[in-house]
């Protein structure tokens, strides 16, 4: 904790914005005396009631709130004397960089974290910030101290932090107000030596991940110690450190003759031993596997490793399973009981008494079961294999050994060698039982790819050309040609007799990450549950359970395919509902496809008859229609920018409930299409959408036209029928912020032929002619227009900041029957309140609408259009 500071976090942040180039104050001749040690509480604010612990998680609150005795750092002697340089830090950590007179750089990292630093300014001071801040209690405040002996025992480069309290000392200069009294971890910052002299651990260069990946790509002499990197990742699995993204590594270069060997240095151990427990996280864990808990169980491997997959997969793919297993065994053997005990005893004695015995036993159990987690990790790395060459000229030989295995050997090419191969740069054999797809990235240089051997190509192969003149030679007799070459350049050559499929398009650079965050997924799949319990007055409660599966593929954004399925039951009426939908984004040449299969026994609509002058003298329940519906609809889709085209077929089976003992308008009139009705036909739609935000647009247009046609087949014995519709929306804002928006919309529909009553052009309800009952008017044509003015009034701080405002509207519409439209236009007006959380990704509204037939209230998501 920081005994001196009591200002709100926003004031702390203001202090941190002080200019960093001020001349540091010189120490006074007689600096004030500071105690050797103090007793502090790392995070008193994390002390909560039993209910909060149950709901939000106990985490490591006991460690945060127990008083601990900690040394005060002596700025005159630590590191030979420390000179503060600048502030730094990540998303939530306060960090002071300092220069030691011993020639080393040091960083002082706050043990406590400050959630406000890692969130958008609009979210600061909200309940959202308070929740995130409280979840820092799931971090282990002294967990980083445990890591050095573990890493040392397995040969991974590491820093060696110590826990100290920064003094209230004028030698901290302008940083004293912010950091004086702060409980910190002080560690050496890995750095390279001056004038090519050895630096940290004898290395010659230290770089971040982005620069390291550039080094690997630029020159084949740069090689990663991949076994050492795997060892570091196994320690992450051991301690449950889920925060090893691309920004949490340093890379050290060591000269080895003509080759440069790079070794990984893990950074920032704030989330080792993290304990994200609590009842609130149980359902959330189904959606977010990174909500991990440190225990004796085998860790959630996806959750622990996910943040580093973008580098794990290309950097570890060269390690075959036998070598992988041997590394796991070696790590287990080196992590002896005494090493684990030594590591745990580095915690403060007060933490040791509370957590030491439990942590020791948990680490031993996780060590003994490390191979189980490592096997899962191997499958993640090997399933979709990313193989990278360099910008030098290379020759890649792919040799099919048999039906199950293919070997890849990459040779560096010597510029003055006619043979072309100088030395092996990379080699590995893949097995279809482990690997589903291989992606070979050639990068720059004039590369040659040689395909040879024979067998069934059960592993899909994608070859991604680089910037040079690439050449593919195919002498293989591989069956089931499942090989693709991607290159948009005109220098790449391919034997026309080859069965390789040439795709003339650029593939994205797979290592183009950094400050923009992780790459979009392009492999694997993700299942998510889809429960729902909606309630309506017509239906009662619906108990619904389902799931979605999102599949990701190469060059397919935002996904490759999407599956949803589910079923529900309405106990009041003993009705069922089930649905299945499947969507493929790119079936062939930019054309997607979808398939919908659904049954609903809970469909309801209103039917008052045809025309503008229909009466509504009975209770509304008299006009209610209960209908069962089975729908089968395959579609194909393509798009060009903001324009989308849908074409498909549709089969629909309808069953209208006309029970005689329940008097209703539908049972007394028996319109065409009541009872059982089967129909089949075709549908089409074209859409142009330039709206800035579909949920709450302030600018842009939305244009859509569609058609449906059903020939005289099945129960359409009165002849073919069909319909067309067109819809146009425009949004006009009178300020850059979109605080005042005028929304205008018009929609028209025409149905021809003898059609079932439920295919009529309806008006009425929340989306078409507010203020009138749902489906109040029906005809063979309809015309509807709406104008709505939306005004932003201000912001409201809830869980997250909400924008809120008011709106006013007027609607008008009419239906036509055989060209006639007696009674003319139906008009309504009204207004309401609207609210939207940050960035308006969702909008909710409350609407009151007045029409000649009464007043209606609507509650729901979005606006009327």
Question: Where are the predicted features?
Answer:
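Residue-level signature of outer-membrane beta-barrel architecture
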Residues: 465, 533-535, 549-551, 569, ...
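C-terminal catalytic region of ATP-dependent kinase domains
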Residues: 136-137, 253-427, 432-439, 445, ...
């Amino acid at each position: 904790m920081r005994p001196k500071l009591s200002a709100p976090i926003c004031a702390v942040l203001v202090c941190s914005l002080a200019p960093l180039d001020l001349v540091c104050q010189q120490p006074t001749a007689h600096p004030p005396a500071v105690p050797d040690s103090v007793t502090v509480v790392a995070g008193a604010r994390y002390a909560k009631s039993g209910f909060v612990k149950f709901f939000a998680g106990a985490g490591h609150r006991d460690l945060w709130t127990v008083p601990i005795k900690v040394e005060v750092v002596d700025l005159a002697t630590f590191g030979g004397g420390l000179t503060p340089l600048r502030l730094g830090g990540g998303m939530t950590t306060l960090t002071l960089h300092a220069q030691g007179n011993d020639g080393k750089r040091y960083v002082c990292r706050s043990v406590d974290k400050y959630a406000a630093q890692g969130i958008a300014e609009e979210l600061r001071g909200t309940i959202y910030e308070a929740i995130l801040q409280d979840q820092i209690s799931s971090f282990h405040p002294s967990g980083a101290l445990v890591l050095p002996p573990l890493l040392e025992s397995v040969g991974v480069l590491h820093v060696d932090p110590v826990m100290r309290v920064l003094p209230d000392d004028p030698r901290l200069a302008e940083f004293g107000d912010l950091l004086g009294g702060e409980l910190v971890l002080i560690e050496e910052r890995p750095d390279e030596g001056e004038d090519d002299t050895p630096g940290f651990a004898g290395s010659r260069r230290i770089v971040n991940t982005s620069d390291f990946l550039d080094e690997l790509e630029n020159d084949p002499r740069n090689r990663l110690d991949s076994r050492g990197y795997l060892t570091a990742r196994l320690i992450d699995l051991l301690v449950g450190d889920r925060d090893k993204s691309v920004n949490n590594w340093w890379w050290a270069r060591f000269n080895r003759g003509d080759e440069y060997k790079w070794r990984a240095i893990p950074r920032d151990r704030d989330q080792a031993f993290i304990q994200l427990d609590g009842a609130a996280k149980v359902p959330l864990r189904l959606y977010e596997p990174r909500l991990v808990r440190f225990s004796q169980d085998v860790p959630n491997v996806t959750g622990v490793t996910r943040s580093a997959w973008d580098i794990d997969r290309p950097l570890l793919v060269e390690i075959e399973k036998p070598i992988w297993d041997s590394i796991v065994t070696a790590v287990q053997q080196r992590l002896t009981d005494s090493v684990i005990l030594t590591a745990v005893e580095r915690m403060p004695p007060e933490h040791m008494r509370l957590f030491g015995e439990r942590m020791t036993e948990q680490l031993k159990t996780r060590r003994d079961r490390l191979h189980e987690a490592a096997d899962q990790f191997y499958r993640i790395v090997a399933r979709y294999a990313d193989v990278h060459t360099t910008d030098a000229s290379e020759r890649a030989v792919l040799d099919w050994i048999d039906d199950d295995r293919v070997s890849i050997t990459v040779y560096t090419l010597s510029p003055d060698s006619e043979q072309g191969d100088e030395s092996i740069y990379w080699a590995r054999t893949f097995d279809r039982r482990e690997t589903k797809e291989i992606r070979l990235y050639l990068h720059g240089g004039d590369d040659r790819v040689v395909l040879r051997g024979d067998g069934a190509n059960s592993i899909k192969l994608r070859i991604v050309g680089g910037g040079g003149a690439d050449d593919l030679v195919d002498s293989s007799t591989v069956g089931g040609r499942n090989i693709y070459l991607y290159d948009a350049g005109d220098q790449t050559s391919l034997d026309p007799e080859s069965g390789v499929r040439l795709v003339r398009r650029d593939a994205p650079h797979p290592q183009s990450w950094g400050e923009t965050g992780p790459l979009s997924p392009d492999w694997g799949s993700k299942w998510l549950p889809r429960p729902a319990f909606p309630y309506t007055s017509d239906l009662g409660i619906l108990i619904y359970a389902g799931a979605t599966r999102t599949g990701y593929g190469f060059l397919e954004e935002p996904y490759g395919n999407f599956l949803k399925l589910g079923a529900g039951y309405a106990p009041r009426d003993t009705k069922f509902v089930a649905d299945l939908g499947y969507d493929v984004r790119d079936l062939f040449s930019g054309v997607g496809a979808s398939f919908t299969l659904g049954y609903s026994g809970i469909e309801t609509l209103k039917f008052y008859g045809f025309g503008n002058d229909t009466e509504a003298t009975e209770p509304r329940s008299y006009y209610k229609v209960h209908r069962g519906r089975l729908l089968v609809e395959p579609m194909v889709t393509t798009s060009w920018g903001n324009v989308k085209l849908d074409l498909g077929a549709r089969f629909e089976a309808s069953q209208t409930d006309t029970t005689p003992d329940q008097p209703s308008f539908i049972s007394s009139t028996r319109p065409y299409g009541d009872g059982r009705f089967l129909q089949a036909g075709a549908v089409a739609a074209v859409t142009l959408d330039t709206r800035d935000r579909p949920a709450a647009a302030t600018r842009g247009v939305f244009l859509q036209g569609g058609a449906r046609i059903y020939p005289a087949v099945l129960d359409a014995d009165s002849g073919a029928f069909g319909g067309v519709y067109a819809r146009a929306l425009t949004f006009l804002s009178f300020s850059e912020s979109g605080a005042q928006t005028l929304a205008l919309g018009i929609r028209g529909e025409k149905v021809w032929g003898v059609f079932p009553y439920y295919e009529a052009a309806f008006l009425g309800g929340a989306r078409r002619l507010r203020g009138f009952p749902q489906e109040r008017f029906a005809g063979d044509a309809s015309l509807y227009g709406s104008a709505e003015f939306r005004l932003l009034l201000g912001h409201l701080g809830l869980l997250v900041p909400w924008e809120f405002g008011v709106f006013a509207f007027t609607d008008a519409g009419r239906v036509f029957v055989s060209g006639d439209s007696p009674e003319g236009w139906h008009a309504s007006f009204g207004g309401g309140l609207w609210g939207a959380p940050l960035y308006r990704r969702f909008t909710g509204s409350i609407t009151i609408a007045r029409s000649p037939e009464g007043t209606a209230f609507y509650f729901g998501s979005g606006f009327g259009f």
